[in-house]
A protein has these predicted regions:
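Conserved N-terminal segment of class I S-adenosyl-L-methionine
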Residues: 1-97, 101-105, 120, 234-237, ...
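Short N-terminal helix/helix-N-cap motif within the alpha/beta-hydrolase-1
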Residues: 56, 112-116, 145
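Short conserved AdoMet
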Residues: 59-60, 78, 128, 167, ...
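Short catalytic micro-motifs in class I SAM-dependent methyltransferases
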Residues: 106-110
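A short glycine-rich, Lys/Arg-flanked "PGG" loop and its adjoining helix->strand segment in the class I
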Residues: 117-132
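Short, glycine-/aromatic-enriched active-site segment of Class I SAM-dependent methyltransferases
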Residues: 133-155, 161-167
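Conserved S-adenosyl-L-methionine
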Residues: 171-181
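A C-terminal cap/extension of S-adenosyl-L-methionine-dependent methyltransferases
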Residues: 183-252
Length: 253
């Protein structure tokens, strides 16, 4: 990711419609798995934690720690007062079976994650048997645009690709859904225009307040929907998976 993107993220993550909406969906999915809220003995790793905003919010469910390869991201984590350490998803700096849960948001698609299977395998390694994995990745090649270039994307996924990626590393998929469904026509149109007009740069930024409110509200509706059904199309894919209590099976192939 371009270094300037971390500053934009830090300024936008708490209130900007996309970040706030994606966080609402993540919190909804976690609350569905942990309806009783926090547990003192629950350790949660955010793999590829960026500037650490999610770590602050996930404290309601347990003790959080982040890992990120970027020193710039870790600097922002320190300014938030959240625990984070330097490391790669391809070689996580934690012992086996360290965490009851791992989250990872828009990380596996990065160009520096050379093999997403190895990254998932590392996450499975540090999860305890019965542990939970919540992952989000960008969806659908048709939505590729200037933002993907700005954040060094390698791939956009289908729901089926995410299922295969997780199951091939021995995880049991409990929930699998697209998200950013209600705004999909808007996003698809914007990305098409970006390509036609050769626009460059990231999508991170604030819209006029009425649009910010509307878009956040629509994603808030999706946050409630995804607890009960799988949305059929969208700009992101969310999955909730568990490591079998007997331990994940060996990867196939």
């Amino acid at each position: 990711m371009n270094l300037e993107e971390y500053g934009r993220m830090y300024e936008a993550e708490e209130t900007q419609w996309w970040y706030a909406g994606m966080r609402a969906i993540s919190l909804s999915l976690l609350a569905a798995e942990w309806p009783d809220g926090a547990a003192d003995d629950r350790r949660i790793l955010d793999a590829g934690c960026g500037t650490g905003n999610n770590l602050s919010h996930f404290r309601r469910f347990g003790r959080t720690v982040g890992v990120d390869l970027s020193d710039e991201a870790l600097r922002f984590c320190r300014s938030r007062g959240v625990a984070a350490t330097r490391g790669s998803l391809l070689s996580l700096p934690f012992p086996d079976a360290s965490f009851e849960a791992v989250t990872s948001f828009d990380v596996h698609y990065h160009r520096w994650v050379e093999d997403d299977r190895v990254a998932v395998r590392e996450i499975v390694r540090v999860m305890k048997p019965g542990g939970l994995f919540l992952v989000r990745v960008p969806a659908l090649k048709m939505l590729w645009g200037a933002h993907d270039e700005a954040v060094h994307s390698r791939h956009r996924y289908t729901r089926g690709e995410v299922r295969r990626l997780l199951e091939d590393e021995g995880l049991e998929v409990a929930r699998l859904t697209y998200a950013n469904t209600l705004l999909f026509p808007v996003i698809a149109t914007r990305r098409t225009l970006d390509r036609l007009l050769h626009r460059h740069g990231s999508d991170v930024g604030f819209l006029p307040p009425p649009l910010e409110w509307t878009f956040r509200h629509l994603l808030g509706i999706e946050a409630r929907l995804v607890r009960h059904l799988a949305l059929p199309v969208g700009a992101s894919v969310f999955a909730v998976a568990r490591k079998p209590r007997g331990g994940a099976t060996a990867a196939r192939g």
